[in-house]
Amino acid sequence: MKIQSVLGPVDTADLGQVLMHEHLTCADWSMRMNFGSRFYEGDKVTEMACGMLGKAAQQGVATVVDGTPVNLGRDVHLMREVARRTGLNIIASTGFYYQEEPWLGFRDEEQIYDLLMGDCTDGIQGTDSKPGILKAGVARAGVTPLLNKVLH
């Protein structure tokens, strides 16, 4: 059996010790686009992530599951670079967290499904990386009508 990593399928027998819920970065895309390096210094983030996860690899970690959802700044290019440099299997996610976002209210279930399935079939952010997990997080208020639509 295989699972998708950001660098391609990995046999589950080769996953080794797994960090199940990590976030290489949580950096809002609208902030990144509007403020650039004043808000997000990609090279520094990459170096920091490689340093920290490189230490984890030295301690026996072989796989990292990055649960950063689309709307919290998931960055597959960062994940791919960290995977290449550290030798770790990095598993990306697709899906949303606290989905009370206005744009979701204007989409029907099929459109939301198509967005997420595009990650799974076409790849994430213009790459051939595909998600290995589906993120489905909700707020303390529970499943609202909008969240019910998204989760469905």
Set out the residue ranges of the language-model regions.
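Active-site gating/metal-coordination segments in enzymes
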Residues: E81-R84, N89-H152
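Alpha-helical scaffold segments that flank or form the walls of functional sites
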Residues: G16-A27, M33-L88, I112-K130
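N-terminal basic/disordered segments at the start of proteins
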Residues: K2-E22
